[in-house]
């Protein structure tokens, strides 16, 4: 670096050896280079790229040294490769019978639910619809003339509840279960055959995205364990690439992932050798079952103890990173301050003696965060500085583990080694750390923007045709889950599958699941039912995407090829195709001309030629094999057994270019390409856009669970989580992503399901009103009906019994427990009177006044702490929030109303027992649903926080004053009361 130049203009690329032959326990990683964008002022243009190789640990394996400068110019047209340079040509040999050998395979199947259960389920739905219609008609025809206001409020609420129930229930008419055949997948893609004599894997590549944004709320140890579980999955190593998106640009996360890359050289071969499950070390070593069960190898006990000791040391290093980085930075900053002071003294002497004028040097050095090599961390500093804050920092790309070779690399064996890895493949998948550039004045679009940056960077570096995204706290629990997802993509008609959604499963939740954190009703009933229509919604994590679907292209049509068509069947720009009336032989693209409108593609994807050229390659590699059962175009067997192109500095430099903050300007990213912007629930909108184009999705339930994660189990965090989801739904309702405006390719029942997503928060208005009706009824002495007639009771009985019957049948075909169903019902009312109501208000404010809504990141749980012995200590953590005021008011009001009504009826000369019975039952129904909320207010061991007593007292005083005012008005002949 030349003197006087800004350090921001010299990017560096990270690099760590992926050899894995030695297993050092040092916390230092071998070598790394950090790459920063060449445009610190956000002005895209040519810049020089300085490559610096840093020697960190001489005991680790050496990496070939690369030094020098790479000059990366702007992507002008003169230097752009033509799109035809990456055209996939099968060649003249495609007519050969060997290449066109047709394979008949089925990788998935439908597991039918009992026809009797489904028939009864649909009959009960019809019965309940009819009974609701008759009941509402009867209610309208029989008003309560003594309390019309009470009758009118109740009827309006009941009409909305019936409408809301229909929106939720109708999409559940066609539930299905899908199963995969992993053995058939292996036989088709990884078994020697005439087209693949060596039996090398013909499976497509997968790019795995792991996202994190705050090292304080998302502990680096949790993220590191997630990375380790991904690196050790049962999928071809050379076909797997892992990207960690650190949107906070934290050095703690950076070094934690580097530590994980080093520990992976021990952990991954150990898992492969002994078939460890789960492959998250924290979860595996924390299992309460016998770890030696079914382990027959004589060396397992010894090697497990060695790996456990190595993991404990790894945990200590990772947990100590914040302190060690702070201590290191303080030491370097002290040296810099001494240098600055000496420079200032030298300047002062020079000015006094020579009487010359020179710029005064800075007396105080910046409080920088330092890397272990003695350079400034280019991301966010602990003490924010210019170009080093959370919203203003450079890009960083670090290749922690190199792309592996195609041939297995066996470890070393023999006595005296801690791990005998003879015959074990010790290769590791490629691992890349990415932190996109952020600058003031640019909208970074939160998680959606970070995901789109990963999509572009991964397209250039590995270009896997499929993308799996995981939150940092969701780890791989089933090492074969990736194969389960690929079964759907590679099956017949798999080319129309946009994504495969896995259910979210959670750990660390209290056995009773007090606040319905498992959300099993949504994951095992709603999403499973949508699987029988057009597919489940995308829920933000645990989802395997087809890259071309994420790019915004339409699904392929069924057609036959005419006149040497070119390009890809996925893209609407292809000409000369006609519908196929009968199933025809699969054909391959072999033309010599390209009919892509490059200008349009470039407008959508940006100026990067590498990115544009990668689109066709990803589409081709993501096709299922050509089979006799498919009328669509497939890829030839054995076409993905070749070697992957190694990474070079020019490629990584281009990856840095596409994650710059200015790259998305005047492109379709976030609007029609990638994750969609404009909502805090970008996941639902992104999946909706795919379904709107006609894509299909599948729901993949595996045994054991594919992924597991953590969920907030205390009441406050749970309410804030639900608030975020509900706010996103309100945003969807008031946007163009409302299902009402969707195109004709979205099926009717799927449209209703998406419409319900946008409407359900508005039910909170009617829930809140309905919860206040019992105390109003008890205080006034009237009920929602004038008298409890037989017709009313019969209708009520039929509606209640039909609901219970539907619940039992849903439990039968979904596999959830009745307790989980009931917990969901309880939290539906708790959330409806708190978070959903606030979400509606926030959404309306955003639409009318343009008030932006911001949310804090939900804290992820970590190991250790003051209550280390109590697994559910967080459950009793009480943090007051204004969201608790409406439910607390409802509880107090209903309890007071019951006591008041009982006393009044008992001491009344003309007691109205029917009204008391109806009102008390009504209020008890509300209180029964509020029980988990009330229990949460009690804290641990029934110790109610003081703030609850304060608010209860205030509410009681307000109610007393209101009652006195009403009584005085009634005595004076006023008309204050509505009764």
Swiss-Prot record:
Its EC number is 2.4.1.-. This is Putative cellulose synthase-like protein D6. It is found in: Golgi apparatus membrane. Thought to be a Golgi-localized beta-glycan synthase that polymerize the backbones of noncellulosic polysaccharides (hemicelluloses) of plant cell wall. GO terms for molecular function: cellulose synthase (UDP-forming) activity. GO terms for cellular component: Golgi membrane. The chain crosses the membrane at residues 116-136, 147-167, 765-785, 788-808, 837-857, 882-902, 913-933, 946-966.
